[in-house]
């Protein structure tokens, strides 16, 4: 009897935490248009790469991910030189992030590696983040670099519906470095 009481309490706590995470995630998705941008785009790294015709790369240490005090943040990407990261923060931790790159000359945008922390999946964070990116960069055709995992195919079909390019796999243009 005591064991079933404990199990009931634990299950109740887990369900309560999941419900709170979902509610918080939905609320955060609704704030996707409130973005704080970190200044800095590694212009000097791109200059060195351009002057050396891509033969010499500057390797930098992985930047520290820091909270800028806004629910949604746009910062220099930590793993791809010249790319940026759009991330959602909740309770001092990032719960969603996607790397992106834009070529204004070719009117193309790429997104890579969207990731949502488990308790906040299916709250609309990824969809809201991608919509906000498109709003910040209107008139672009949107692609991804890599193929899509079979399990993520429904997600890409959903978020790509009606979007120019549809987040289909697309190579980088000559003006953009893979990072």
Over which residues does each language-model region extend?
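Residues forming the Rossmann-fold NAD(P)(H) cofactor-binding site
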Residues: 127
